């Protein structure tokens, strides 16, 4: 049978009219593979980087790899029941967490859900976990102190509001203890605290929460938990979630302190995710952007100026600066600070407190190595009296360490060297401090004054801790006015010096230690 051209064209038109275009929604996709918490999705042409993807069972995944014909996403939560062919949907939102003063005193997970059994959160809205750090013009230089309550740190390595001060050391050197004491010392100062626990045992975190509660510091602290049993995705995102909660206070003209415990575990979680997403590995198998991972997080800790706060609050808060101070913790292996992640974080932060195993084991706690610990901006924020009296402490310790090494080889030492060694020994002993016993500015100043002005020279080294405890007790009971004055003003002048001398002379005459 032969068809003419008219019939052929009619037949084609008829077929075209009968053809139904199956319109596939651009926001629906299908899972094509599930491996170790990473899902690969086909479809989702409109998906954005970092977007939340809705999964069955009220779960979400975050899109991290956008490839030509598929998307790599990391599941936030259990993934064992996800299979090929499951439909997923874009949400058009990036991950947000609850913020506000209602979170203070609560323990939450990475997504901001309460896990302390105290009921629902009274939050003040939601904010994204990923934010751009304030620009140069919006910042203000650091000039107010954050007192950690440790003599050795506040005298030698001072921390200012808006600073990033790294706490670095091997395992079991007192890194967490130092950070927790810094949080406890903020009680009554108006500084809001955030403690982010990454990849730790749940029992360890429970112990930290109990200690904060015992010392009355939990009421002004938010605890964000991504324990070792949580997925790598939640461990990687926990610091960003905690930072957003801290920024809420900074942007409203308040002061906040955030502790990341610790960023080594976050880097390991991020490495795991990146390798599963088949991103090319670099040094120590970390991905190429692990520096950016930490820099974009730590740059968000800053001191912002009054104009920024006024603009952010639409004129509600005027003439007040806000700050977010960060104390990131990094765990080293065998004291190796030249490994990839430690060098990265050292270069990002404004100084580091280096804790040493040898010092810790020899009973010097906090085990601060004064030689390589430094605060790059904290000096401008130091309290006047502590700055004046603590100036000779670092020098005394440095000279003592050098002379102690030298004196092992020298049989006979001259009097000046022996005096310097004895002074160094006493200062080293004085720098020891018990956990959960933070000191006020006045107490710290009194101890430093005693060391600086030679009041310890005739005290036995074994008795120095007892001498200090008795001295502080005597000062708080007999010279309460002077203690209150120093705590309030932090000033140091001839009059205060004379009063401190009188206090120490009278105390030494009592011989009550």
Swiss-Prot record:
Keyword hit for Glycoprotein: no
Assigned GO CC terms: plasma membrane; proton-transporting ATP synthase complex
Record GO terms (molecular function): ADP binding; ATP binding; proton-transporting ATP synthase activity, rotational mechanism
Cellular localization per UniProt: Cell inner membrane
EC number(s) given by UniProt: 7.1.2.2
Superkingdom of the source species: Bacteria
Coiled coil segments of this chain: none
Assembly, per entry: F-type ATPases have 2 components, CF(1) - the catalytic core - and CF(0) - the membrane proton channel. CF(1) has five subunits: alpha(3), beta(3), gamma(1), delta(1), epsilon(1). CF(0) has three main subunits: a(1), b(2) and c(9-12). The alpha and beta chains form an alternating ring which encloses part of the gamma chain. CF(1) is attached to CF(0) by a central stalk formed by the gamma and epsilon chains, while a peripheral stalk is formed by the delta and b chains.
HAMAP family named in the record: ATP_synth_alpha_bact
Protein name: ATP synthase subunit alpha
Originating organism: Pseudoalteromonas translucida (strain TAC 125)
Gene that this sequence comes from: atpA
